[in-house]
A protein has these predicted regions:
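Extended glycan-interaction surfaces of carbohydrate-active proteins
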Residues: 1-73, 93-117
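Aromatic- and histidine-enriched alpha-helix N-cap/loop-to-helix transition segments
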Residues: 23-27, 69-77, 86, 128-135
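Extended aliphatic helical segments
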Residues: 1, 46, 70, 84, ...
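Well-ordered alpha-helical scaffold segments within catalytic/enzyme domains
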Residues: 1, 28-42, 77-88, 139-150
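Non-catalytic C-terminal accessory modules of carbohydrate-active enzymes
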Residues: 89-192
């Protein structure tokens, strides 16, 4: 549905005059195991897609337009694939890279930031993204607890994962992680 803000193009004319590197970019094509659950996390399609997308990583995060620009928040989608595959180590490594590229409220720029350069953002770039903050907050929630598997309409067929991704730095002796009344498909969860 056109917004009225600008003219829309569809079909072949949309790529007319564009260099190929600007088309066919990785975006949400990695959402194969989570949240869609189309494939098992260890399925060849999932693992091959993750491996392919990582080839264009820069500074530890995803890029856009085949490596031309950094893209901070979309990295959360890959982190969730690693999370459900049980690869906590890679999920944490990518998470730390993600938050290194975020502001104090987890906001991030969508793109148009060149890798390994200064942080001067192209003035045509959308302002810091609240969506980045939302995705980061939800990712942290999923590190504490997340639901997965089975039939989403039948809780008894689903699994609840408590603290599936925890950094060793978060579990020092004498300290503890806690959740109080965290909402889930299984009701409110309290854990320490």
């Amino acid at each position: 549905v056109p917004t009225g803000l600008y003219d829309f193009k569809t079909g072949k004319q949309t790529s007319s005059g564009l260099d190929e590197y600007r088309t066919n970019c990785d975006w949400e094509n990695m959402l194969l195991a989570y949240p869609t659950e189309l494939f098992q996390p260890k399925h060849t399609y999932v693992q091959s897609t993750l491996k392919h997308i990582r080839k264009n990583y820069a500074e530890g995060i995803m890029t856009y337009r085949h490596g031309e620009f950094l893209h901070q928040y979309i990295t959360a989608n890959l982190i969730e694939q690693y999370m459900v595959a049980g690869d906590s180590r890679q999920a944490l490594i990518d998470f730390y890279h993600l938050i290194l590229h975020a502001g104090s409220t987890h906001e991030g720029f969508e793109n148009m930031i060149f890798p390994w350069k200064d942080r001067l953002v192209d003035p045509r770039c959308p302002s810091p993204h609240a969506w980045a903050a939302a995705k980061t907050a939800f990712l942290i929630r999923n590190f504490m607890l997340h639901e997965y598997g089975g039939n989403i309409e039948t809780a008894s067929e689903r699994d609840l994962y408590i603290y599936p991704v925890v950094s060793p730095a978060w579990t020092t002796p004498g300290e503890h992680l806690a959740m109080v009344n965290a909402p889930s498909e299984f009701g409110w969860i309290t854990s320490r």
